[in-house]
A protein has these predicted regions:
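Charged, often glycine-rich, active-site loop that binds/positions anionic groups
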Residues: 117-133
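Loop/turn elements at helix/coil->beta-strand transitions in domains of secreted/extracellular proteins
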Residues: 51, 103-107, 161-165
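Catalytic cores and adjacent binding grooves of peptidoglycan-active enzymes
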Residues: 40-45, 129-140, 145-235
């Protein structure tokens, strides 16, 4: 019995593979170049001081010192008029969420930086204020955007998997919390609710039953390799 060998053009296959890889590389470079060429501007409104501002904090992949200083000023602890250095990645996170939801109205800031004194004062009033809040580190913002459902903001923030996402639909002024700390969310969503946000189960977020979603290991591997977050730009 003779076995028929299938002809295999190794050279041709390598050429096609190289061509495909080259095309992929070109697309990747184009995407990176496009991202670096962006001008990132945040339109903000402080719900307490009534201040309005438009801050351009990044251009051509680089953070702008003047824009960062203006963000530090605007997102200050308004109660004590104290400032800190706001995490530039927080600005990126909020900007990317804003773009993703297709918003057009200014972002209404409820809270951002909190001095330790202000945080301690608020902790005495509410058990929902963390002792080591990301707000005290300049890494958090509580906000809402007129015309955008709060649930949509939460889902978009969850998908970014950059840090924490809090959901406060019953607050006097309903808002979401986003920070650049560890990946987590509250209140914990049920498994079915989280599955609607992540149909493939690929997420670092844990549902209320405390068990990881089906794609957790893949999400964790991507997170460790840096694929889930963009590389840090230059300041």
């Amino acid at each position: 019995m003779r076995t028929r060998l299938v002809d295999f053009d190794a050279v041709g296959w390598l050429k096609r593979a190289a061509k495909a890889a080259g095309a992929f590389a070109v697309v990747s470079v184009c995407l990176v170049t496009f991202a670096q060429a962006e001008t990132r501007t945040l339109k903000l409104y402080n719900t307490h001081t009534k201040e309005r501002v438009s801050i351009t904090f990044k251009k051509n992949g680089r953070y702008l010192p003047d824009g960062l200083r203006e963000a530090n000023r605007f997102l200050r602890d308004w109660r004590r008029n104290e400032m800190t250095k706001i995490d530039p990645e927080l600005l990126d996170l909020v900007w990317e969420v804003y773009q993703k939801v297709g918003a057009s109205q200014p972002i209404h800031v409820v809270s951002s930086y909190r001095s330790p004194a202000t945080n301690n004062m608020l902790r005495k009033r509410s058990s929902g204020v963390a002792k080591n809040s990301q707000h005290t580190l300049g890494k958090a913002m509580d906000f809402f955007i007129p015309g955008v459902k709060l649930a949509t903001l939460r889902a978009t923030g969850l998908r970014k998997e950059v840090g924490g996402v809090g959901y406060y639909p019953r607050s006097g002024s309903p808002f979401v919390h986003m920070d650049t700390g560890s990946v987590r969310h509250w209140p914990r969503m049920s498994r079915s609710e989280l599955a609607r946000v992540f149909p493939d189960g690929k997420t670092l977020h844990f549902p209320s039953d405390g068990k990881p979603m089906s794609g957790y290991k893949v999400a964790l591997a991507e997170s460790k390799s840096g694929r889930s977050r963009s590389s840090k730009p230059t300041i």
